[in-house]
């Protein structure tokens, strides 16, 4: 199993950021939809597991649910998809390296965020609502998860979102660190399970679960909008700052000197 050094990973992430802004609009839209749908499918799997577990199991319930959630990001990385939270890291690093412009970054972020939302809505409505997978016996659990995302203050929600994308982007960083299929799965699985068990907030996952509850007749689109703002900002800080800027500052200059 081959591993890249951190300075090599930094270069790979920057190259990925350049490639992402070079995609055609149709490709960007399709991959953005898939990214949102894949993350939502991972969350749907999480809900189906949690809904059958007794509450008396305590924290073990969250661990088991968190163990299956990473399927979503595995599909994004291994099958192909664009996820806004990952792009917050890769495009920011390419911007820091002066390989792309701020306009191209914002253009990508807007389209990918929108299409991630479309993908999340698709899974929430078609599979969650029409298919009944987040309703019936699973509705109480779905509502509890969604309401848990909404009861925190703006500031606390933002902080929880920072922690989330710190771990999500570390998962992607580890995935860039190896070309081995199994290595990528392991690298993704551990940090993503951690963010779910801890209770951090990820903007695309929240799009799915809150929308599912809206379609079931609970909550409103304004609830989703109020949650979106602090979570998106926090995810940007976690991805572009705590991972992207931190590793660019430490490794990119060193790698450039080596070349």
From Swiss-Prot:
MF (Gene Ontology):
formate transmembrane transporter activity
Q: What is its main location?
A: membrane
Q: Which GO terms describe its cellular component?
A: plasma membrane
Reaction(s) catalysed by this chain's protein: formate(in) = formate(out)
Record localization: Cell inner membrane
Keywords associated with the record: Cell inner membrane, Cell membrane, Membrane, Transmembrane, Transmembrane helix, Transport
Q: Name one Pfam family in it.
A: Form_Nir_trans
Output the PROSITE patterns linked to this UniProt entry.
FORMATE_NITRITE_TP_1 (PS01005), FORMATE_NITRITE_TP_2 (PS01006)
**Topology in the lipid bilayer:** Multi-pass membrane protein
Q: Which InterPro entries match?
A: Aquaporin-like, For/NO2_transpt, For/NO2_transpt_CS
Q: Which residues lie on this side of the membrane: Cytoplasmic?
A: 1-26, 98-108, 177-187, 251-259
**What protein family does this chain belong to?**
Belongs to the FNT transporter (TC 1.A.16) family.
Protein name listed in UniProt: Formate channel BtFdhC
């Amino acid at each position: 199993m081959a591993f890249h050094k951190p300075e090599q990973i930094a270069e790979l992430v920057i190259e990925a950021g350049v490639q992402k802004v070079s995609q055609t609009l149709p490709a960007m839209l399709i991959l953005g939809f898939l990214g949102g749908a894949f993350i939502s499918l991972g969350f749907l799997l999480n809900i189906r597991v949690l809904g059958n577990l007794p509450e008396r199991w305590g924290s073990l319930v969250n661990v088991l649910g968190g163990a299956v959630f990473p399927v979503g990001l595995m599909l994004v990385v291994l099958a192909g998809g664009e996820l806004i939270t990952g792009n917050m890291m890769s495009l920011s690093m390419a911007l820091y390296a002066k390989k792309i412009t701020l306009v191209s970054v914002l253009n990508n972020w807007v389209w990918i965020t929108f299409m991630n939302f479309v993908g999340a809505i698709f899974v929430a409505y078609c599979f969650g609502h029409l298919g009944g997978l987040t309703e019936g016996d699973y509705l109480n659990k779905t509502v509890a998860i969604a309401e848990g995302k909404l009861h925190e203050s703006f500031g606390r929600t933002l902080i929880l979102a920072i922690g989330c994308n710190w771990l999500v982007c570390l998962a992607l960083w580890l995935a860039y660190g190896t070309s081995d299929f199994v290595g990528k799965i392991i690298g993704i699985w551990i940090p993503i399970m951690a963010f779910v068990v801890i209770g951090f907030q990820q903007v695309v996952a929240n799009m799915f679960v809150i929308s599912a509850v809206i379609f079931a007749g609970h909550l409103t689109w304004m609830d989703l909008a109020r949650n979106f703002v602090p979570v998106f900002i926090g995810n940007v800080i976690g991805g572009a700052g705590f991972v992207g800027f931190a590793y660019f500052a430490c490794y990119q200059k060193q790698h450039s000197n080596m070349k």
